[in-house]
Structure formats: structure tokens, C-alpha cells
Regions:
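Extracytoplasmic/periplasmic sensory segments of membrane signal-transduction proteins
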Residues: 25-127
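Extracytoplasmic/periplasmic sensor domains and loops in membrane signaling proteins
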Residues: 82-98, 126-155
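Sec/Tat signal peptide C-region and signal peptidase I cleavage site
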Residues: 17-22
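Loop/turn elements at helix/coil->beta-strand transitions in domains of secreted/extracellular proteins
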Residues: 107-109, 146-148, 181
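Bacterial N-terminal signal peptides that target proteins for export
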Residues: 1-8
Length: 192
């Protein structure tokens, strides 16, 4: 009986280590993908210009105004008329991001760029909300400073069954080094 208890304790004590190593592998794979495949275009002029233009436009916007825009976005998701959503999806940055997603051959499930307040500047496809400023993807990148990366836990997508994660990266103005926004990339781990 002592042997069984000891064996059970040993087995249970290994579980967190196994999970930790699995998480480390997931994070390491995504970091490699970011460095090799994403960084080369993260400072593309279309991204930097779009973020800076929106930052200037929304500089004096209150959180109340931002929440109103987010609510407007959420309401339009289920509506036939989507003027606000369509305007964002028709932006040159959104088309650029959609092309990057398409070029990834299924590895990238979504891309969206956020401004200095956490609002979407451009996106490859429809997101469930417009304001990310209250979420870790923006808070753990933009607020943390240049080169900040936040890799979320891996989850099974309920609609596709694919194992996915999101990686978010602070975006800096190459001319000044100032953090101006962030990008979130949905990554299909089964394709990585």
C-alpha cells in the first residue's frame, strides 16, 4: 500500500512539470515564428503610418467615448448594416493584414493592430470587439514597452477544433523607438 501511495505521489508531482514543458515548447515555437517570419514586416510603413495617424486622431478621446465605439462595433456584428465595421475592414492596413494572413497558408488565424489606446487600427477579419485596451493582449505589450511580447495560453478553438494561441507584440516607431501600438496574431499551433 505504501508503494502505491508513493507511486501516485510521484506521478502527480510530475504533472505540473510536464505541463510546464509543454507550455515552454508552445511559447518557444511561437517566439521562433515571430523572430523568423513576423518581425521582418512588423515595422512596414503601412503599419507604422496607420497607427500614428489613428493615435493623432484619438489622442483626446475619453474612455467613455472608446467604450461607446466598442459598443457600436458589438451592435453592428449582428446587424445587416455594418458601416463602422466595414470602414475598418476596408482600410489599407486591414487589406495588408488580410494578405499576410492569406500568405501564411493557415498558420495565422487572425491579425489585428491596435493603437495607443487599445482600439483596432486594422484587422484581417472581423473581431468580436473593437477595443482591446482592457485586455492582456494590449496591456502586456503596449504598456510594457518596446520589444514586449505576450504569448497567451494554447486553447482549442471551439468552431475549428484547432489548437491555437495568440501572440501580441508591442510596435515601436522605428524613427524614435517610442511604442505606438501593438499587434495580435492568432496562431494555429497545429500548423506551426
Amino acid at each position: 500500500m505504501k508503494f502505491i501511495k508513493l507511486a501516485l505521489i510521484c506521478a502527480i508531482s510530475l504533472l505540473p512539470v510536464t505541463s510546464l514543458h509543454a507550455e515552454e515548447a508552445h511559447v518557444a515555437q511561437i517566439r521562433d515564428y515571430i523572430d523568423l517570419d513576423l518581425r521582418p514586416w512588423l515595422n512596414d510603413e503601412i503599419i507604422i503610418t496607420a497607427i500614428k495617424a489613428q493615435n493623432e486622431k484619438v489622442a483626446d478621446m475619453s474612455e467613455e467615448d472608446i467604450i461607446a465605439l466598442d459598443n457600436k462595433w458589438r451592435e453592428q456584428i449582428s446587424s445587416d448594416a455594418k458601416p463602422f465595421i466595414d470602414e475598418v475592414l476596408d482600410r489599407p492596413l486591414s487589406k495588408f493584414l488580410a494578405a499576410k494572413q492569406s500568405e501564411s497558408a493557415g498558420l495565422i488565424s487572425e491579425l489585428f493592430v491596435m493603437d495607443a489606446k487599445g482600439m483596432n487600427v486594422g484587422q484581417s477579419s472581423l473581431t468580436s470587439d473593437y477595443w482591446q485596451g482592457d485586455e492582456a493582449k494590449w496591456q502586456k505589450t503596449y504598456l510594457e514597452g518596446a520589444d514586449a511580447i505576450f504569448i497567451d495560453s494554447a486553447e482549442v478553438d471551439g468552431s475549428t477544433g484547432a489548437l491555437q494561441s495568440q501572440a501580441s507584440i508591442a510596435i515601436s516607431d522605428p524613427a524614435t523607438g517610442e511604442v505606438i501600438g501593438a499587434i495580435t496574431i492568432g496562431i494555429n499551433l497545429d500548423a506551426l
